[in-house]
Amino acid sequence: MSQDQPIVLDPTYASFDAAARPADLGATHFIGIGGAGMSVLAEMLHAEGVAVDGSDRAHSAKTDRLETLGITVEFGQRAENVAQAETVVYSSAIKPDNPEIVAAHAAGKRIVHRSDILALLMNGKRAVTVAGAHGKTTTSSMLSHILVNAGADPSYAIGGFIQGPDGTTLDGGHAGKGDILVAEADESDGSFAKYHPTIAIITNCEADHLDHYGDEAHYRAAFVAHAGRATGHVIISIDDPDGLAVLEALPADVKSHTVAYGTTARESLPDLGGAAYVWIASESETAGSGVEQLTLHLPAAVTAGEPVSQSVALKVPGVHNARNAAAAISAAVLLGVSPADAANAAGTFLGAARRFQVRGTVKQVTVVDDYAHHPTEIAALLDAARRRYPDSTIRVIFQPHLFSRTKFFAHQFAKSLAKADDVIITGIFPAREKQADFPDISPSTIVDAAAGLKDASAGTWIQPVEDMCLAAKMMAMRAHHGDVIFTVGAGDITDMDQVLLTALEAHRESCE
């Protein structure tokens, strides 16, 4: 990057070729090292022997974890933080005027997007990428869990923690000794164009991130291109119309090594153009049992032998998790795990952190935290909640994520949230956006949309409450024995769980 040129940060620009390896980076500095995706990559490079440090705005569980590994984290972003670095890594949340970007540019240092680091880590590995609007973290976590149980010791880069036994969490990054790497492939900024995986899993192609892609056609085209870069197999859900449209748009040579999956029986589907098909025969969860029963009908193209009908009993609820399991198990079998071993391991998977994660129970009121931040994810979450807690009142505190997403999907959010009994909408988590650019968008945008739904929202109490702490106390006051309260969203709503549990204990507590 020339020092005389203006600073342009392009996450789609590929900085490395297939021959590059971690040792080529030299001392590496991460801007925003505590971010979900950044911390995982920093930890993996550290395990590869690269000298890693970073900066962030504030302490977090992620930065604490990195510091325990011996990685230096500076708090506050300043020019001097990059003085010793040869490579500086940024995410799409970092702007060109960031003081560390400016200093690195002035010094002629190598500046690369986080996706460049992930692409480099894939070099020389059998890489499995998991892309899609929904289900990336759960699917990649489940696949990693299956492979670990199979003794493969995979590397994995997952944008979150994995639920372990007894309420523990396992880190989402690991540099294994095996030749497999499992990674979430973030489609939000187009940077997954750099990846050339052995297996490309596409969990869902429903429209999202239209602030980047502009329209649904360009969004779907990005998935078609991503599938075309897979050197082995493509695994794609066709339960949604957009997924089926992507499959239909694939060139014939790509379809020939594509495995579609879904809940519709094969004979009821249109011609798949030569793609194989995994049918998910899902049985309803026995009310309140905590077990999702299904049968996967795996074709010969997956098993490399005779077709197999494999029973699976999942501890993660909902039809959406049956789909996630179909993708994870299919990929594991393609990588050499037996169908039975893959299914057994999937049955011991407890979920990714912040995915239907029970945080506590007070006075017979259960608090569950979930990352859902798209209308389809919220609908799937609440459907699963009704299956898991059939006799309970379902209450939701929802923090919208991004003003643009709230604007695009206000009516869809209202319709999905109508599946709950009580809903409070908190202030919007801005992430990379600014309220000033969306002056008319607020929690009331969704509440107003709900008012126009008529029958769909009948019986659902829904209110806007900007302050999350106040929202938690209000919901605690409304709760009764046997209720389930969900904190929902991709922002910092998860930090309210302890406030909510404390408020439930006393029905009054300050947030101080």
Swiss-Prot record:
Residues that hold ATP according to the record: 132-138
Main location, first listed in the record: cytoplasm
Protein localization: Cytoplasm
Keyword hit for GTP-binding: no
Pathway: Cell wall biogenesis; peptidoglycan biosynthesis
Catalytic activity annotation: UDP-N-acetyl-alpha-D-muramate + L-alanine + ATP = UDP-N-acetyl-alpha-D-muramoyl-L-alanine + ADP + phosphate + H(+)
GO terms under cellular component: cytoplasm
Gene Ontology terms for molecular function: ATP binding; UDP-N-acetylmuramate-L-alanine ligase activity
GO terms, biological process: cell division; cell wall organization; peptidoglycan biosynthetic process; regulation of cell shape
Family in the record: Belongs to the MurCDEF family.
The name this protein goes by in its record: UDP-N-acetylmuramate--L-alanine ligase
Recorded name of the encoding gene: murC
